[in-house]
Amino acid sequence: MAKHKTHFEECDVLVVGGGMAGTGATFEARHWGRDLKIICVEKANIDRSGAVAQGLYAINCYMGMQWDENQPEDHVRYARNDLMGMVREDLGYDMARHVDSTVHMFDEWGLPMMKNEKTGRYLREGKWQIMIHGESYKPIVAEAAKKSADKIYNLSLIHISEPTRLT
C-alpha cells in the first residue's frame, strides 16, 4: 500500500480542481489578487484534466461584436427561446458581453483558431460557433494557470480535516 504524504501550506486562495473552471479561476485569482498566495490542487494533471482536455472543434459562444455580427441582446433572445423562457436574462447578458474578450485572450495565448485569411474574422460553423483546433485548448489555459499560481499540486487529493482546514 502506498504511503500518502501530507503537505501543510498556508494560502490566500485555494483552487480545488484543475479543469477549465479551476485553471480559469487560478488565472482570475492572480489577476484580481496580485499579492495573494494562490495554490491549485488537481487529482490528475492540469495539462490534460477535465472534459475540455479531450479536445474541442469549436467555441460555442462568440458574439463577433467588433464586426457587428451579434450583440449580447441577441444571445439572450436565443437562450430564452432555446430554454423555453427558463433563463436569468441578466446573467446571460453579462456572460455574453464578456465572451468575446475571453476568446481574443485565448487567441493571443496561441490557441489555433480558423480565420478568414482576407478579413481576419473567425470562421463560423453557425450563428454562435467559431472553429478552432482544440487539441491544444486545455494545455494553453493550463499554462496560464501555471504562470498565475504560486504552487500547483498535480496527482493530489484533499481531505477536510477541520471546518477551516484541508489536508
What do the PLM-derived regions correspond to, one by one?
Residues E9-C11:
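Core beta-strand elements of the Rossmann-like FAD/NAD(P) dinucleotide-binding domain
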Residues A25-E28, S49-Q54, R165:
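Short acidic, glycine/serine/threonine-rich loops at helix termini
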Residues A25, V141, I160:
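Aromatic/hydrophobic pocket-lining residues that form π-stacking "cages" and hydrophobic walls in ligand
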Residues M1-K3, A25:
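A generic local structural motif
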Residues K3-K5, K37, K43-L157:
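Conserved N-terminal/central alpha/beta ligand/cofactor-binding core
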Residues V16-G17, K43, E162:
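The Walker A (P-loop) glycine that initiates the GxxxxGKT/S ATP-binding motif of P-loop NTPases
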Residues V13-I39:
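N-terminal Rossmann-like FAD-binding beta1-loop-alpha1 element of flavoenzymes
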